[in-house]
Amino acid sequence: MSSPPAVVRERLDRAFQVVAGKGGVGRTLVASAIALRASQRGERVLLLEVNAPDSCARFLGVAPAPDEPREVLPNLWLCRMTPAGAMKEYALLILRFKALYTLVFENRLVKYLLRSIPSLAELTMMGKAWYHTTETLDDGSPRYTRVVVDAPATGHAMTFLSLSRIVADVVPPGVLKVAAEKMAALIESPIDSCLHLVALPEEMPVNEALELAVFSAKKLHMATGIGVMN
């Protein structure tokens, strides 16, 4: 089998890769294959599912790993992100102390308020994804050399990927603005990130993939990855 073109290899070697497309086109299968390929080449890979029904675990033939990364195969870690789990982890990163998190975020009224904030779930899950790209081992090397994100279906993927830049541009200076800027910078990195698109050879999936490609270039300023026609 011939090796892939250099531009394809370069995209598949990027540190932060997002796989997106219309629901039912095989997006999760492609994300799992990309992550498995990298892990078999010796990379330390984290595969993140965004609030999904453990499809990555099913494709890989392993047990689900909700909220916390777990090594499921050699060099391959899996984590299904949920809004509640991402909120807890992100809050603990800020508050540092679990007792303080429990006092504030487990309060019934606070929990109700948080549920009422539009798109907060997407922002905290993007924050969790960004955080995992910054983790290091004791020797200072990256804990994960690849982070592959199985994004939600097209409309939700647009929100998931665009929200950090929107928040960074509109909120006043403070902790939230700094965090959103870091998330947006990761998505917009011309060398570290890319967006892979998956479609079926049918009109609606292809149109949604093209729409997402245009949105990525004009709104997200995110590099294009590879296109997969299942």
Question: What are these language model-derived features?
Answer:
Residues 22:
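P-loop (Walker A) phosphate-binding loop of NTP-binding proteins
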Residues 3-9, 25, 29-33, 40-41, ...:
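Conserved catalytic-core segment of NTP-binding enzymes
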Residues 84, 112-121, 167-175:
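Flexible beta-alpha connector loops of hexameric P-loop NTPases
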Residues 36-106:
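N-terminal phosphate/diphosphate-binding loop that engages ATP/GTP or pyrophosphate donors
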Residues 92-133:
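ATP-hydrolysis module of ASCE/P-loop NTPase motor domains
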Residues 12:
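Residues immediately N-terminal to the Walker A/P-loop in ABC ATPase nucleotide-binding domains
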